[in-house]
Amino acid sequence: MDKIQKAKSISIWIFLIPFISVNTCLILITEFQWIFPNQEDIIHNTIPYFDGGASISRTVRPYPSWLIFKPAMFLTSFLLIKYWFYCKDIIISFNKDHKHIKKIIFFGVGSAIALTIHSIFLGIKFDNDLYKLFRRVIMLLFIIFEITAQAYLVSTLYSFKTKLDKYINQKILKMKLILVSTLIIVAIICIPIISWPGDNFKFLKHLLEWDYFLGVITFYLLTFFMWNKKV
């Protein structure tokens, strides 16, 4: 099936582009401080996946980091929209009346739109509490919509998984189920921590942010390996 191959090929880029761009920005701001005009922007000696030494926003927001990150996120948003429509076509080919098709498109495309809006405002400094709240809400919507779309997709594939034996690696599908379930549980548990005002648990918040980001995009890496049989 042509749509399966397209979804497979596009999924690896949805993983690689954000992963490479955010970690490139991290390396630049920690190891190549001289390229940053404002030396207050630089970060020293941190591996935020383990120590939570800086947030993703703090890493990618300063110039020239955003010159890398913004285009990468715009491209990722575009690829996400294409990916979710490919998934829609795949589902229709197996069950054209499946009840989750519209939900998958709504939340999948919605997550891409939220990511685009967040990227547009990234790097724009505006000292206003309402503006800061707006950015946080948009980022929260991206996470909620993305995880919801992933959950509906995995649930849908499971509903006719016997029909997919010819096309899919069932072990990877189970891994995706475990991943999405973990992301949902972690999100529910960590909402009180993330929502806590001030700098309390700051490093834990940052650590969770980086690792959660990695978990969300790993879904697409697993997608690449899931459709690993010739179709």
Please give the residue ranges for each predicted region.
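Interfacial helix-start motif at the membrane-water boundary
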Residues: 51-76
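Terminal transmembrane helical module of multi-pass membrane proteins
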Residues: 151-231
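Membrane-proximal helix-loop-helix units in multi-pass membrane proteins
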Residues: 111-169
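Membrane-embedded alpha-helical bundles of multi-pass transporters/translocases
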Residues: 104-114, 183-191
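Cytoplasmic juxtamembrane regions at transmembrane-helix boundaries
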Residues: 80-110
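Alpha-helical transmembrane segments and their helix-start/interface "positive-inside/aromatic belt" motifs
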Residues: 2-22, 102, 168-179
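Alpha-helical transmembrane segments of multi-pass membrane proteins
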Residues: 18-39
